[in-house]
Structures are given as structure tokens and as C-alpha cells.
């Protein structure tokens, strides 16, 4: 309350001060000084150069030890005005009331806690008093118990020693009793067939009998036990040799014989011999299933039988052998490995024979499942008998079967391709029914392409089963690398594409062999098929293969560009051969028409010969046929009078000097020399020039071969006047229709000029027909 009285009231502001407004300036300076004091870390007294703390002897210091209320009140009355004193009193009253209220609240809030704490302390004091009493009683009881225990121990010391001695004697007597009863126990166990119990009895007593065998009584017991043990060993050997029981029972017999001290080497040989008999029986059972009987199980059942019978038995034999004859060391392990290697090779031979019967089937799913079970079953013996190499041999068999399946699928693709070509041949050779058109070349080409592509996809899906994640051998290095790159991509896909190209090229053989009977339309279709493969199909197939079979092998593979180049070359050869075949067909007609006619005695021409009409018809049909598969191509600019030109013996400049009216015998000139001079300035015609992949180039090649044949045949014949005129009419007719098929019409003009000029040279009386008459005959024809 003294502090509250000393504090100025909240209502005393600057206006109530006696200084009034004049005190505002010093107040601001004090605030500024206070901020500086806080900045430099100085107290108010230090900032003014005075001591920082109040005087401890000051009687007006409310917090000091020498505070004097009377002095403090006198000071306030002297220094403070009445208004400030009243404000101080009001503020003091308010603070006293607030303090009183806070103290009452504090007392009320903690009253219950104080009461509870008091009760708890009182109860703890009572409990500790009771505990001290009980501890005292416990200490007294413990002292009494200790005293009694000491007296009892002292009293029982001598009897305890006697009891210990008696217990030892009793145990010895029990052991002796067991030893004396051992022969009878062994005999009873042998009679009951409890061979394991008998061996355990013998094992427990063996060391004692060996130790005390110098005593007559123990010696007799040992002799009796040896006789019984010998009989027991004989019965165990008899049971083991009978082999009627399974592998676990035989292993138990061997284990008991080893416990009886029988020679391990001899038992090892007998154990393997009996195991060989059982496993060979399993092999004979498997071999019996390889017969041609219709009731023979499928390959999946066969591998299940072999896995559960032979492989399971081999695992049992290996596990029992390693457990029983572990003391044999490396020699025993090698003996077991040789045993497993020999029988395993016979089992693998049977499996391969059975798998070979599946090579003709087209479904890989059952075969892959069988291979998976076969490979999975051999994991256990492969781990037990690592030295025998069973797992590696099984993997090699699976890899070999996979390679054979790839070869089988390649043959299937080749057969499918040949079958498609056979279908095309039949469709081309089938007679046309009136009013019903057969399939066109474009449709046949689409059918062949889709059929081949579907067979390729089916083969890829079939061989992809070998690399499925759920298959146990798919993680082997071969199936993650070489199988995908060299097997599927190179052997199957690339091999088939090359085989297809070779088969197509075989149709280009010389006449009289295979190519002589090949329909020209088939050559045209195959050339377009190979060209389509070069442009898109090869890239698509190889991309599909690489996506399905993620190649992890770094071995080199055939680039796409190489295959495309081979396919394009095959297409070029086929198209070139097509041009030759069609050209020879037309040439044969022209040659026969020239060679079988008597040109010296022929009549004056009135019509175009029928063979020329047939040539134009066949050429038009070829144009339609080629147009179904190939684009038009590029032609040179055509002259406006291509169809109006009329051939005559003087249409060529080299013949004008001979047949023009101005020619007189007084100006002789060798016509052959004139013809040869003209040839020097004419463009050379390459009859068998490379054929481009368009219709114009194909027709140009065929027409060049035909007209060149006509020219050579004409040069070998002699013509009369009317014969020359007939050739003139025929050539004009050909010119009217053939110029539109070739890339350059000048080529047709040049060759036909050569034909007419050659006929004129071979005519003794060359009198040409008037051009107007020729045109009339051709228009009428």
C-alpha cells in the first residue's frame, strides 16, 4: 500500500502540474534521454553522471530497508499540491481494492488444494508409521527363520550326505540294470520291428560296454549284444535290398546301418544301385509313353510325369545321399554327380524325343508350358547337384527347341507365301464367267500382302511366348539377347524376307525352266509386292519385331536399308523380266507373220493385216494390266500430228534421193551407204534399257522389243512391190495406235521408219503407195 501511495495517480497529467505547459519541454527531453539511455545500455543515474542505484539509507524509498512512513508523508505534503494528493489517495484505494480482490480469488482457488494436500500428508504419515511397524515385525521373523534354518541344516548334514551316496548308487544300479536288460530289450525290438529304438539302445550302451569289456559280466553282455546287432544289421540289409519301400524308408535303413557301424563305402554303392533301379523304372515308364499310340499323353502330361516321377525321385536320392554320406567328402560328391549325370542324360534324351514330336504342330502355347515345367522342375536337382550340370543341360534343350521352332515358323511362312502364289496362279488361270469379273490384280496383290503380313504377325506372337515374364527360362541370357536379335529378327523375319525375294527372283529363270511357265501377270504382281515391301512393309515389320522383342544383344543385325535395297532390286528384275516376256510374246506373233508370208507374190494391200490388229489389242491389254499396279509415269511433250503421220518409202530423208521423181540413173549413189550415213546422225535405241517403276516405261520397253524384232525379221525377207506396200500400211497402222503408249513418240516413228526403209531396201521394185491411200486403208481397217 505504501508503494501505491507513492505512485502518482493516473489522473495527474501535465495539466495538473504546477508548472503547467512549461513542463512539457523537459518531459520531451527526458524521453529523448531515456531513448539514448536504452540505446547505450545506461541507467538513468549513469546517464546524468550520478550513481545508478537509490540511496539504501533514504527513508523515503518505498522499497528500501529504512523506509519511514512519517517522513514520506511529510515529504508528500510539502512537495505535492492538494489535487495531486487526492488523486494519489484515489489511486491507492483502487489498487488496494484490486489487490484485496486478487488475494481473495487466489485463496478461494487454492483452498481445496491446500486441504487435499494436508489430508494426503496426514495419511502418508499414518501409512509410514504402519509400515515401520510391519518392517520391524518382518525383521524379527527373518531372524527367527534364519535361526531355525541353521539348526535344521546342522541336524540334517549327516543324513544328506548318506542320501546323496544312496542316490548315486541307485543311479548306478539303474544303469547296470539297463545294461543287464539290454540283450532282452534288443531282442524284443528286433522282433517287433522297432529297428530305430534298438539302434538307439545299442548306441547308448556302446561306450560303457567298450569301457568295461575287461570285466567278465560286461563282456558277456557285449557278446550277446553283438550277436543281436549282427542279426539286426542283417534284417536291415535284407529290407534295404528288397527295395519294396520308398526312398525315405531305404534312407532310414542306410542311416541305421551307418549307426550300427557298417562300412560307409559299401552302403554308398548299394544305396546308389537301388536308387538307379527305381529311377530306371521311371525312365522305362516314360519311354513307354513315346509310342505312336493315340492314347499317348500330350507333351505337358509327359513333362509332368517326368518331373514328378524321375526328377522328384532324383531329388530325394540326392538329398538323402548328401545327408547320409556327407563324410565321404569330394569323392562321394563326384560319385553322386556322375550318377545324376548319367541318368539325367537318358532322361534328357527321352524329353528331346518327345519334344521332337511337337515340331509339326503350329501352336506354341502347349509346348512353351511344357518347356517351362520341364525347366522349372530341374531347378531343385540343379541346385543340389551343381557339379552334374543338369540345369545347364535343361537350358540347352530349351534353347535348341526354341531354335527349331524358329526354323519351323520360317518354313511355315515360306509355305504360306508359296500357297498365296498358287492361289494367284489359279485365280489368273480360272476361266472368266460371262457377266462376272474375277478379282483384279490390285485385289490379288492386296490379298497376298495381307495374307503374308497376318502370317508374320501370327509367327511373332507365337515365338513371343518364349520370352514371356512368367516363363522360368525367359530371364536366361539367350532369350534376352541372341534369341531376339539373331533368332527372331535375323533368322525368322530377315530370313523370310530374303527367302521371299529369292523365290520371286526364281521366276526370272530362263525360258524352258521355271520362268517359262510363269504367267506375266504374276511377274507384274510380284514386282509390285517387292516394291511395296521396299517402300513401307519391311520397315514396319522390323519395327514391330524390335518393339515386341526388346533386343539386349549387341551383335550386328541387318540394316533396314540393306533389305530395302534387296527388295527393290528384286522388283526391278521382275519388272524387267515381265517386259521381256511380254515383248517376246508380241515379237513371236510379228516374227511368224513375217516369216510365214510370201512377200514377193502378195496381192495389192486392201486391209491392215490381222496380226497388226492383234498387236495393238495385246498392247492395249498390257497397258490396262500394268495400270492396275503402277502409276502412269512421265511422257515427253506430244506433237499434234502424231496420229496423222503417213509412212512411205520416201518419208525418211535418207530415202528421198532414191525414190523422188528427180532421181535419175545419171546420179548413181549407193543406197546402203546413204542409209549408214543417216544412222550416224540418229539417236541410238537401247532395246533392253533399264525399266522404271511406271506404266510408260514398261510399255516403252515392250514396244521397243516388238518393233526391233519386226525390223530384224523384215531385213531377212525379200519383198515385192505389193509386199512393200503392205508393210507400209501395217507400219502406219501401228504408228496410229502405239505412239500413245511410249514415253517418246519419236522412238516409235524412228523404229517404224527403219522397218519401212529396210523393206524398201529388200524390194527389187520399190513403188510406194500414196499416203492418202494408206490413210484410207488404215481408217477402214
UniProtKB/Swiss-Prot annotation:
It is found in: Golgi apparatus, trans-Golgi network; Recycling endosome. InterPro entries: Cullin_repeat-like_dom_sf (IPR016159), Vps51 (IPR014812). Its main location: Golgi. The modification Phosphoserine is found at residues 17, 43, 648. Residues 115-146, 269-291 form a coiled coil. It comes from the Eukaryota. Residues 1-18 have a biased composition (Low complexity). One of its GO terms (biological process) is Golgi organization. Pfam families: VPS51_Exo84_N. One of its GO terms (cellular component) is Golgi apparatus. Keywords: Coiled coil, Endosome, Golgi apparatus, Lipid transport, Phosphoprotein, Protein transport, Transport. Residues 1-66 are annotated as: Disordered. Disulfide bonds: none annotated. Acts as a component of the GARP complex that is involved in retrograde transport from early and late endosomes to the trans-Golgi network (TGN). The GARP complex is required for the maintenance of protein retrieval from endosomes to the TGN, acid hydrolase sorting, lysosome function, endosomal cholesterol traffic and autophagy. VPS51 participates in retrograde transport of acid hydrolase receptors, likely by promoting tethering and SNARE-dependent fusion of endosome-derived carriers to the TGN. Acts as a component of the EARP complex that is involved in endocytic recycling. Belongs to the VPS51 family. Component of the Golgi-associated retrograde protein (GARP) complex, also called VFT (VPS fifty-three) complex, composed of VPS51, VPS52, VPS53 and VPS54. Component of the endosome-associated retrograde protein (EARP) complex, composed of VPS51, VPS52, VPS53 and VPS50/Syndetin. EIPR1 interacts with both EARP and GARP complexes and mediates the recruitment of the GARP complex to the trans-Golgi network. Interacts with STX6 (via N-terminus). Interacts with VPS50 and VPS54 in an EIPR1-independent manner. This is Vacuolar protein sorting-associated protein 51 homolog. The gene is VPS51.
